[in-house]
Swiss-Prot record:
Residues 215-265 are annotated as: Interaction with SecF. Changing residue 361 to S: Loss of function. GO terms for molecular function: membrane insertase activity. GO terms for biological process: protein folding; protein insertion into membrane; protein insertion into membrane from inner side; protein transport by the Sec complex; protein-containing complex assembly. Belongs to the OXA1/ALB3/YidC family. Type 1 subfamily. Disruption phenotype: Lethality. Upon depletion experiments insertion of Sec translocase-independent integral membrane proteins ceases. Translocation of Sec-dependent protein decreases to a lesser extent. Also leads to decreased targeting and/or translocation of Lpp and BRP lipoproteins. Both spoIIIJ and yqjG of B.subtilis functionally complement yidC depletion, whereas Streptococcus mutans yidC1 and yidC2 only partially complement depletion. Residues 24-264, 527-548 are annotated as: Can be removed without causing lethality, dispensible for M13 procoat processing. The gene is yidC. Pfam families: 60KD_IMP (PF02096), YidC_periplas (PF14849). This is Membrane protein insertase YidC.
Length: 548
């Protein structure tokens, strides 16, 4: 095998990847667009008995920190809107990214409350509680590190329920604390719940998966338990009423999309029921319900949970709850993407530019792989040296394929040549390439990350297609500099057009990925020349002009 055939192997692997991508798209098609009727109804009559009545109309209050802009409905205390000021909606946009939304076209809310026999959110006890608040807007002031938003409700029996949102500067984790004061003569049986509900179908203005070459990251529900660290739950499964219903001590429930996530993390000593539900009107939900606790007469009970609402920043998510960082969707190559990202982030802490970090990590990867690359070129050189003997063997043995195969293997053994030695480095490079692809499309740190000049977003395609063209040029030079034993006219034609074909494919790839491939090709050219000089000294390579 020589460098020309290497390109054929790469092309085969690449085409296989594209076919797999298309199959994934066909296997998990996006639901047909449909209008979602605005509603605040939550799961009713589900397997977990997680019934909550319609919210009705409450007052909307604004809660702002340096990183969160929330809108909370005083009817039930649900978070109906979440804006992320640190993350623009689009490149060069002044509008913040909206994670939670309540509109006629799209529903995505973080709901929570107190159910159980005596809970104010129990449908049997009437409408959801209408909380009282001191003001309509809460803002984290300069020099202030914590913002508390207390909401109180007193039922007909005189029992007081206080729901307090606690937000901290620079933090996407919101603590939701409940305080129950029993003013009656009987114990109160209370359970807490947290629920995330979302329209299954994305409206056109939110659906960004328009490119057939884009990597479609997971969008749906997920959960974690001590037994199952991370499990995805598809919206389609919920829509088919195949719902989750398990008990867990600890863990979390979440809804995921590219770069961003919401999650409820309950904090209690008992068990929680994790569930999903099809709420109708094209809305799916995932949530938890805690084990009931008793609040004795004249006593006060407390329940706590945490809501994560923001970007998938792995180290911060891991600090909030075990395994919450696994929500970053690195696909089936996560075991390569995760350490690759950690190394990339470490490099970025020194250079301050993600593009230069990609360049440096490319040099590191190719440096580590240099012994394999050298072995690859040495193996190919030995194979070329054996070609006259192999050709003479074929002429001598004619059509006796069995004897040809036997004598070729004996020749390889005698000359200490591995006929597959040229393939192994390629089989390693391809997973690294794909892992980098997953990393670019799954790491929020690389979303809208600029490099230099015209590249303002390494996770998006090059707007002027300059990088893909440069990549094609580097492939052309590698091809021209590589000796070949390809004699078949059809293979020669394919090899001639290979740089052009790859250039076309790479037009739609993230510019960070194309940058990696360009630098990798440039390193290949340098390593190739160094290796050829060593092979010349051993008589395994000559500098004669390559035949076209």
């Amino acid at each position: 095998m020589d460098s020309q055939r290497n390109l054929l192997v790469i092309a085969l692997l690449f085409v296989s990847f594209m076919i797999w991508q298309a199959w994934e798209q066909d296997k998990n098609p996006q639901p047909q667009a449909q209008q979602t009727t605005q509603t605040t109804t939550t799961a009713a009559g589900s397997a977990a008995d997680q019934g909550v009545p319609a919210s009705g109309q409450g007052k909307l209050i604004s809660v702002k920190t340096d990183v969160l802009d929330l809108t909370i409905n005083t009817r039930g205390g649900d978070v109906e809107q979440a804006l992320l000021p640190a993350y623009p909606k689009e490149l060069n946009s002044t509008q913040p990214f909206q994670l939670l939304e309540t509109s006629p076209q799209f529903i995505y809310q973080a709901q929570s409350g107190l159910t159980g026999r005596d809970g104010p959110d129990n449908p049997a006890n009437g409408p959801r509680p209408l909380y009282n608040v001191e003001k309509d807007a809460y803002v984290l002031a300069e020099g202030q590190n914590e913002l508390q938003v207390p909401m109180t409700y007193t039922d007909a029996a005189g029992n007081t329920f206080t729901k307090t949102f606690v937000l901290k500067r620079g933090d996407y984790a919101v603590n939701v604390n409940y305080n129950v004061q029993n003013a009656g003569e009987k114990p109160l049986e209370i359970s807490s719940f947290g629920q995330l509900k979302q329209s299954i179908t994305l409206p056109p203005h939110l659906d960004t998966g328009s490119s057939n070459f884009a990597l479609h990251t997971f969008r749906g529900a997920a959960y974690s338990t001590p037994d199952e660290k991370y499990e995805k739950y598809k919206f389609d499964t919920i829509a088919d009423n195949e719902n989750l219903n398990i008990s867990s001590k600890g863990g979390w429930v979440a809804m995921l999309q590219q770069y961003f996530a919401t999650a409820w993390i309950p904090h209690n000593d008992g068990t929680n029921n994790f569930y999903t539900a099809n709420l109708g009107n094209g809305i799916a939900a995932i949530g938890y319900k805690s084990q009931p606790v008793l609040v004795q007469p004249g006593q006060t009970g407390a329940m706590n949970s945490t809501l994560w609402v923001g970007p998938e920043i792995q180290d911060k998510m891991a600090a909030v709850a075990p395994h919450l960082d696994l929500t970053v969707d690195y696909g089936w190559l996560w075991f390569i993407s995760q350490p690759l990202f950690k190394l990339l982030k470490w490099i970025h802490s020194f250079v301050g530019n993600w593009g230069f970090s990609i360049i440096i990590i490319t040099f590191i990867v190719r440096g580590i792989m240099y012994p394999l690359t050298k072995a690859q070129y040495t193996s190919m050189a030995k194979m070329r040296m054996l070609q006259p003997k192999i050709q003479a063997m074929r002429e001598r043995l004619g059509d006796d394929k069995q004897r040809i195969s036997q004598e070729m293997m004996a020749l390889y053994k005698a000359e200490k040549v591995n006929p597959l030695g040229g393939c192994f480095p390629l089989l390693i490079q391809m997973p690294i390439f794909l892992a980098l692809y997953y990393m670019l499309m799954g790491s929020v740190e690389l979303r809208q990350a600029p490099f230099a000049l015209w590249i303002h977003d390494l996770s998006a395609q090059d707007p002027y297609y300059i990088l893909p063209i440069l990549m094609g040029v580097t492939m052309f030079f590698i091809q021209k500099m590589s000796p070949t034993t390809v004699t078949d006219p059809m293979q020669q034609k394919i090899m001639t057009f290979m740089p052009v074909i790859f250039t076309v494919f790479f037009l739609w790839f993230p510019s960070g990925l194309v940058l990696y491939y360009i630098v990798s090709n440039l390193v290949t050219i340098i390593q190739q020349q160094l290796i050829y000089r060593g092979l010349e000294k051993r008589g395994l390579h000559s500098r004669e002009k390559k035949k076209s």
